[in-house]
């Protein structure tokens, strides 16, 4: 269904298990967003298998907790690592811009004028964002239709749909 990775794509493979989203988050934060202070507690977990959303970020009412939800399908082995990397980095851009975080809000709208992609480029994530966008454009909807009922069970990926 999906092509094998090229050498350029393999560059973005992380040494962290997809099950350890906290490890992914802190690796990405340390490596690409060291200029962004963590001003509250940040939790990350897999969420619903949305068809048209890869992630979300929310701030608690008392501003003490940020939650980043990641589409559960991104832990599937057919999804390239750069899609997960880019999704988490995308949510960190929102955090940095004051959406889903107590930091001052920098813009009126979170995606105005392509600000997220510009920020990802500025943080040396231009190649992964391009690869991610290409993969999403070419494979996401067919992948979703085939695997949206898929759930990892007891740490092992199983496809409920043949």
Question: What kind of feature is each model-predicted range?
Answer:
Residues 2-58, 99-162:
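Metalloprotease/metallohydrolase-associated module, dominated by Zn2+-dependent proteases
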Residues 46-50, 72-74, 91:
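Generic secondary-structure microfeatures
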Residues 61-66:
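Active-site beta-strand-loop-beta-strand hairpin of nuclease catalytic cores
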Residues 68-86, 101, 108-109:
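Short pre-active-site segment immediately N-terminal to the catalytic Zn-binding motif
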Residues 86-98:
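Active-site recognition of the HExxH zinc-binding catalytic motif
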